[in-house]
From Swiss-Prot:
Protein name: Large ribosomal subunit protein eL24
One GO CC term on file: ribonucleoprotein complex
Summary of subunit composition and partner proteins: Part of the 50S ribosomal subunit. Forms a cluster with proteins L3 and L14.
Cofactor: Zn(2+)
Organism name: Thermoplasma volcanium (strain ATCC 51530 / DSM 4299 / JCM 9571 / NBRC 15438 / GSS1)
Gene3D superfamilies the record matches: Ribosomal protein L24e (2.30.170.20)
CDD domains per record: Ribosomal_L24e_L24
Residue positions binding Zn(2+): 6, 9, 32, 36
Protein function: Binds to the 23S rRNA.
Zinc finger (C4-type) boundaries: 6-36
GO terms for biological process, alphabetical: translation
Keywords recorded for this protein, A-Z: Metal-binding, Ribonucleoprotein, Ribosomal protein, RNA-binding, rRNA-binding, Zinc, Zinc-finger
GO molecular function, one term: structural constituent of ribosome
Domain of life: Archaea
Amino acid sequence: MLARTCSFCGKTIEPGTGIMYVRKDGAILYFCSNKCKKNMIGLNRVPRYVRWTNEYHELKKMRTRS
């Protein structure tokens, strides 16, 4: 089986766990938890600005290097 990554926080999702969400346009989003799904779908939050996501930490590293 193929391990997936969460579309919001960037964590790896083990096979048989997580949530697969399909948008009306056919885009498939994978979530590791209901917390990630609620933040992205329900609250329309962007992972860049949420402190506990991998994308936020990667951008923070880039900012502190410069």
